[in-house]
Amino acid sequence: MKKSGILNKELNTLLASLGHTDTIVIADCGLPIPNEQARIDLSLVKGFPPFLSVLDAVVDELEIEAIVLAEEIKDQNPDLYESIRARMGGVPVQFVPHEQFKAMTKQAKAVIRTGEATPYANIILRSGVSFSSKDF
């Protein structure tokens, strides 16, 4: 049995498959996911698992070089926005209108659906690399 970190088989497989610049989405329970889109549905009941718990688990295991948020999150869900900023540190953030965000999710390798039930609790994570030429 795995000792720590993410236990979900599908989520582990997804994260291990990501290469540089690949994107994934962590979504609330209301974000529309196209039928043809790969998805990992972690939702159990409204509110569980919460968005931030899933984000924390993914951030612990994935090198992230940039994120995308719906610009509406700043006004419609400022507490969540501040929590995301605190977790992401200096990672560059791109803000786009929610409709554009939904269109961008179609390019992601997968959407991870949480039970989160607050507005605009969605994020696109762009995979980075965990080494640089300075390492050699």
Swiss-Prot record:
Its main location: cytoplasm. It is an enzyme of class 5 (isomerase). The keyword Transmembrane helix does not apply. Its EC number is 5.4.99.62. SUPFAM superfamilies: RbsD-like. Homodecamer. This is D-ribose pyranase. The lineage of its organism: Bacteria, Bacillati, Bacillota, Bacilli, Bacillales.
